[in-house]
A protein has these predicted regions:
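Glycine-rich, highly charged phosphate/nucleotide-binding loops
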Residues: 4-21, 128-138
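Short, polar loop motifs at secondary-structure junctions
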Residues: 1, 58-64, 77, 96-99, ...
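Structural motif
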Residues: 27-28, 89, 149-150
Length: 166
C-alpha cells in the first residue's frame, strides 16, 4: 500500500501529464509502468522535464533462465515466425501485437493469444481476454487443455507473471 495519492493514466500524452503535474503541484513523478510501456515512460520523462520535477523510474529485474529452461530470443516478428516453425500450438502472451498477424498463421499451427481484452479469433486462432496474475495451476491447466507446445512472451520480469514459465 502506498501512503499517497495514486492516479492511473488518461493524461493526454506528455503535455497533458506536464499540465496535471503543474496543476496538482506534484514535486516527484514515479514511473512504475510495465517494462514494455516505452511510450508511457518516454512521456513521463518528458513531462517531468517540462514541469521541472524529478522523475524516478521503478524497474523490475528480468526473469533469468534456470537450468533446463529452453529460452530462445528473437529480434523481431520475422525471426519469431521462423523460430516457431517446428511448433504447432503456441500461446502468445504479448498483448495485442499478434492480433495483426491472425491471417498469417501457417496451416500446421493453431495459435492461442492471451490479451487483456477479448478479440475475435478465426479458424486458426483463439483469443482469450484475461488479466493476470494467474495461478500456476491455472497456467498448467491452460497448457494441458489447449495442448500448448511453446510459450511466446516478453521478458517483463515480475513474480506475479512468472507462473506461465513454470
Amino acid at each position: 500500500d502506498l501512503h499517497c495519492q495514486v492516479r492511473v493514466g488518461g493524461y493526454g500524452g506528455a503535455q497533458g501529464l506536464a499540465q496535471y503535474i503543474r496543476e496538482q503541484r506534484i514535486d516527484l513523478l514515479l514511473d512504475a509502468t510495465h517494462p514494455y510501456a516505452a511510450q508511457i515512460s518516454q512521456n513521463a520523462a518528458l513531462a517531468a522535464g517540462l514541469s521541472g520535477v524529478l522523475c524516478w523510474a521503478l524497474r523490475r529485474p528480468a526473469w533469468v533462465a534456470q537450468t533446463g529452461d529452453d529460452w530462445r530470443e528473437v529480434a523481431d516478428w520475422a525471426h519469431l515466425v521462423q523460430a516457431l516453425k517446428p511448433f504447432h500450438r503456441p500461446l502468445f502472451t504479448l498483448g495485442r501485437e499478434p492480433l495483426a498477424h491472425r491471417d498469417e498463421i501457417p496451416e500446421s499451427q493453431f495459435w492461442t493469444l492471451r490479451a487483456l481484452d477479448h478479440y475475435p479469433g478465426n479458424e486458426r486462432c483463439d483469443v482469450i481476454g484475461a488479466r493476470g496474475p494467474f495461478l500456476i495451476d491455472e497456467e498448467r491447466a491452460l497448457f494441458e487443455q489447449r495442448r500448448i507446445d511453446v510459450l511466446i512472451s516478453k521478458n517483463s520480469g515480475s513474480s506475479a507473471t512468472e507462473p506461465k514459465l513454470e
